[in-house]
């Protein structure tokens, strides 16, 4: 009875059985058995859905998503209301999932990188952790970047993202990140290994521009000549001091 997707036919069939039970003088017994059956049915469905995984086309990674159905048509969940009738809620009409958690080495604050499929290609956006935990905060940053989130489905999207993060601690283990140049322990940014930049996007190009280029030996020989001038030598010392000092 409950496996059918046609709610009208489902209701008609239950009413027919109820009338037959009433004619037999066992309506109350039928109602009790039906309630118990529906409760068991719902629990079984929840158990079956608890191990679901994301199934997006060309997804960057596969995650456990609990009771959410995460497919190319969007993210949704079926729940049963107070009358034990199935209801569907939609968290997002297109694929989206957390793919990376960045933990700032200076502040210990976390940011979450979300991947979402729009216009036939996967795109990414990184937001503060509290944005993904608040239905009011999540709408602005995500919607202006193309994610279909509104005040109506925001709370469901927050629940979905929270479930994905909570169910995948190994796949989404926080990675160290930094938003500045300079020393980080015994390593110096931007040359440190396995540390991500997660600062203001407007300064990322400047951050990436600091890199090794040219011939060190030629530079060294030329600077050796320039350092014969005391003023130039002082300028060299001043420019290097911020790097030398932690």
Predicted regions and their residues:
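Conserved glycine-centered beta->alpha loop in an early N-terminal alpha/beta scaffold
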Residues: 6-227
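Positively charged, polyanion-binding regions of nucleic-acid-associated proteins
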Residues: 1-3
């Amino acid at each position: 009875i409950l496996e059918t997707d046609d709610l009208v036919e489902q209701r008609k069939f239950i009413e027919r059985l109820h009338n037959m039970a009433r004619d037999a003088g066992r309506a109350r017994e039928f109602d009790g058995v039906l309630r118990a059956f529906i409760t068991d049915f719902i629990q079984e469905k929840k158990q079956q859905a608890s191990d679901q995984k994301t199934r997006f086309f060309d997804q960057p990674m596969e995650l456990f998503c609990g009771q959410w159905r995460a497919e190319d048509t969007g993210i949704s969940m079926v729940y049963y209301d107070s009358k034990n009738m199935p209801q569907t809620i939609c968290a997002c009409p297109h694929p989206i999932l957390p793919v990376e958690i960045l933990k700032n080495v200076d502040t210990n604050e976390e940011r979450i990188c979300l991947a979402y499929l729009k216009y036939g290609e996967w795109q990414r956006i990184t937001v503060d952790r509290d944005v993904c935990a608040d239905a009011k905060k999540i709408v602005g940053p995500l919607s202006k970047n193309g994610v279909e989130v509104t005040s109506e489905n925001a709370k469901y999207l927050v629940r979905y993202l929270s479930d994905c993060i909570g169910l995948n601690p190994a796949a989404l283990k926080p990675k160290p990140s930094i938003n500045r140049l300079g020393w980080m322990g015994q390593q110096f940014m931007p040359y440190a290994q396995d540390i991500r930049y997660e600062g203001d996007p407007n300064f990322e190009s400047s951050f990436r521009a600091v890199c090794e280029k040219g011939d060190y030996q030629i530079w060294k020989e030329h600077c050796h000549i320039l350092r014969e001038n005391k003023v130039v030598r002082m300028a060299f010392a001043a420019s290097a001091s911020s790097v030398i000092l932690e």
